[in-house]
Design a protein with these regions (language model features):
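Nucleotide-sugar donor-binding catalytic core of glycosyltransferases
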Residues: 1-63, 67, 79-88
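Non-transmembrane alpha-helical segments in soluble domains
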Residues: 9-13, 45, 112, 129, ...
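Short acidic active-site motifs
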Residues: 42-43, 106, 110
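Short alpha-helix at the nucleotide-sugar/activated-sugar donor binding site of glycosyltransferases
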Residues: 72-75
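Glycine-centered loop/turn motifs
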Residues: 94-95
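Conserved acidic donor-binding segment of nucleotide-sugar-dependent glycosyltransferases
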Residues: 98-104, 114-118
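A short, well-ordered alpha-helix in the C-terminal region of glycosyltransferases
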Residues: 113, 120-134, 144
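C-terminal alpha-helical cap of glycosyltransferases
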Residues: 138-153
Length: 153
């Protein structure tokens, strides 16, 4: 997974500006601006909201489920470009609420496209944000839990 991430970041850095926030010391990739880790709860939402593209590369050992990072990006109002995740499609619409890619080349093509099409990118980010507010608030999740409990009783 880390090799996949590094490969994607390297390919992306050849076609657009890339900044990586990381805890890893000694991370040096040509063409990638490496910044030290920022606080996930305080600073990361601001970074997500203000970045043109937020990349999610899910670890290969995570076989099912929606990555929390994907929800965090959309919840902050950021544009999400993620590897394919079938569970995400159960709640949201690909190309309307987020964008997915199938490999590094596809990721780069889509990153360039959405950097060049700012209005479309911002619309997708806004749709994703609205969808998170509709479906993933504490109120909504608690209601779902009570619905499950009621069915079991």
């Amino acid at each position: 997974s880390s090799m996949e991430r590094i490969g994607i970041l390297r390919e992306l850095s050849e076609v657009c500006d890339v900044t990586l926030y990381t805890q890893s010391s000694g991370c040096d990739m040509r063409g990638v601006r490496v910044r030290e880790y920022i606080d996930y709860e305080r600073d990361m939402p601001v970074m997500f909201a203000n970045s043109a593209i937020n990349l999610n590369v899910t670890l290969r050992n995570i076989r099912t489920g929606i990555p929390l990072r994907a929800l965090d990006i959309m919840g902050a109002g950021g544009f999400l470009l993620t590897n394919y995740c079938p569970e995400l499609n159960e709640y949201m619409t690909e190309g309307k609420d987020f964008v997915s890619y199938i490999d590094a080349g596809d990721c780069c093509e889509k990153a360039v496209y959405y950097i060049e099409h700012e209005a479309e990118r911002k619309k997708i980010a806004a749709n994703g944000h609205d969808r998170i507010l509709d479906m993933f608030t504490y109120e909504h999740q608690i209601k779902k839990m009570f619905d499950v409990i009621r069915k079991e009783l």
